[in-house]
Amino acid sequence: MRIEKHSNSLIDYNQPLSFVFNNKAYKGFKGDTLASALIANNVLYYARSFKYGRKRGIIGAGVEEPNSLVSLEIGGRYTPNMKATEIMLYDGLSAVSSSNPHSIDFRAMIKPLHRFMPAGFYYKTFIKQKVWSIVEDRLRSLSGFSKAPSEIDEDVYYHIFQHT
C-alpha cells in the first residue's frame, strides 16, 4: 500500500526497519513515521472511539491527528498517549494502541451482546452483587485510554520536578 518512490521523499527505502505494534511484527523504512509504516502494512484501524467503540484510523498527517494515540515501549520507558503521526520509526520500536489494545478484537466478539449492555448497565446489574469483584477488572479494561507506567524509569535526568 506504499506510494511510488518520489524524489522529494524523506523515506529511505534502502534502510528497512522492523517494529512491533499490538504484539505483531511489521516492517518499515528509515524516515517513516509509525503512522505511515502502519498504513503501508495495511493496518488501517488501530483505535476505538471512546463512547461507542467504533473503529478509528488515521485521518491527518501531523499534530492535528485525533485518532492516533499509541503507547510506546515497555517497562520503565513506557510512554502513554503519543501520536503515531509524530513518532519517527526506529528499529525495534514497540507500540500498542492507547485506546485499549486488547479490546479491538474482544469488542468484535461481544458486539452481538451490545443491545443487552446499554450505558451504565453494569451499575444496575453487578454493583450490589458479589459478582462485582470478579467482573470489575474486565469491565474497566474495556473503557478508557492507556495505562499508567508501572515500573521505574532507569534513565538519568538532570532535572527533577518534585511538585507533581
Task: Annotate each predicted stretch with a short phrase.
Residues 38:
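Carbohydrate-associated surface elements
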